[in-house]
Regions:
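SAM-dependent methyltransferase catalytic region
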Residues: 1-335
């Protein structure tokens, strides 16, 4: 029987906030968008279908700004307390609406090409880990498994997942970590805190940050306590080869050190942890490539808007409020 490891079947995140494998045609990015929007915003991006390649020259949407990023109102609420800061963020948004010149467009295309290479390696790595953590089990009445290798322990599965996929305790970050940071960066700009208005990146700073993540080799590579040179020294040959190919083709990147040394990237990671950005096609890249999606998903989508309910909250402490149907002005006040 097919018995997949539960650790690769379950992810945590906000299913409504994430980046996708969608792209813009380069000609749409050469001029400012209509109605003061950034380039390309008048036209929906095209999806790169599972198993297909990105069209030549097209640019991934999560490398580009959106006119709703860091969008706060100056009237009421936070606008009364931070009007000047919000005006600075508004000025930043206006700066994003100009078209890209030939040099910047070439940079975006090179970054998109780097994403393609990292995505292919991530998909291959995820597929291999899934195969190695799926145990064949005999079930009466079912066909014999093709292979009856001994099952791996949960500890070994966890170890493989956390080190090879999430690069925990490893100097060179996996393709997954690098891609996730880039996609998280795009999401984080929608939630950029007002009190961090002076750290929001200019267009050139954003491109430079993306180059550090995707192309690498900008920081020293000395080890620190508890870290390993690349990945497990006891790793299988295929995993070792993938790590060497990754360094040769996409440079050396330590995501954790990048985030420690860069205020912006550190804030991106903090916002990602807080809001739980979830990129479906990245989290299940091998499944999307193999079958285009899912036959069945189980979870708790955030369909219900979270609101404050005086009666419901206070009745947890004093049930009489709910039982007697007291209105707000009749609720007892406790010191």
């Amino acid at each position: 029987a097919f018995v997949p490891w539960f650790g690769m079947q379950l992810t945590t995140g906000n299913s409504l906030i994430g980046a996708r494998r969608q792209v813009y045609e380069p000609s749409l990015l050469e001029e400012s968008g209509g109605r003061g929007k950034p380039p390309g915003m008048e036209t929906p991006p095209e999806r790169v279908e599972p198993g297909e390649s990105r069209p030549e020259g097209h640019v991934y949407h999560f490398l580009l700004p959106d006119y709703e990023m860091a969008n706060y109102s100056t009237s009421g609420g936070p606008g009364d307390l931070a009007e000047e800061e919000i005006k600075e963020l508004r000025s930043w948004r206006r700066d994003q609406k100009s078209g890209y010149d030939a040099e910047d467009l070439k940079t975006l295309q090179q970054l998109s090409q780097a994403i393609d290479g990292l995505w292919e390696k991530h998909t291959r790595q995820q597929r291999r880990i899934r195969e190695q953590t799926t145990d064949p089990i005999k079930v009466w009445g079912q066909p014999e498994p093709d292979s009856m290798r001994p099952p791996t322990t949960t500890r070994r599965k966890d170890e493989k997942w956390h080190t090879e996929m999430h690069s925990e305790g490893v100097r060179m970050s996996s393709p997954y970590r690098r891609l996730k940071l880039v996609m998280d960066y795009w999401c984080a700009l929608w939630f950029w805190p007002i009190d961090e208005h002076d750290t929001v990146p200019t267009r050139q700073e954003w491109l430079m940050d993306l180059q550090m993540i995707l192309e690498g080799d900008l920081y020293e590579t000395q080890t620190t306590a508890g870290e390993q040179q690349v990945l497990f020294e006891s790793m299988e040959p295929e995993a070792k080869q993938l790590a060497m190919d990754l360094k040769d083709e996409h440079g050396f990147v330590n995501v954790d050190k990048l985030c420690d040394r860069s205020l912006r990237l550190g804030l991106v990671q903090e916002l990602a942890d807080r809001y739980k950005f979830h990129h479906w096609e990245l989290e299940y890249a091998d499944l999307f490539e193999r079958c285009g999606g899912f036959d069945l998903t189980i979870g708790n989508p955030p369909w219900v808007k979270v609101t404050w309910d005086d009666t419901g909250i206070l009745s947890d402490e004093e049930p009489k409020i709910e039982v007697r149907g007291w209105s707000e002005n009749k609720m007892p006040i406790r010191g």
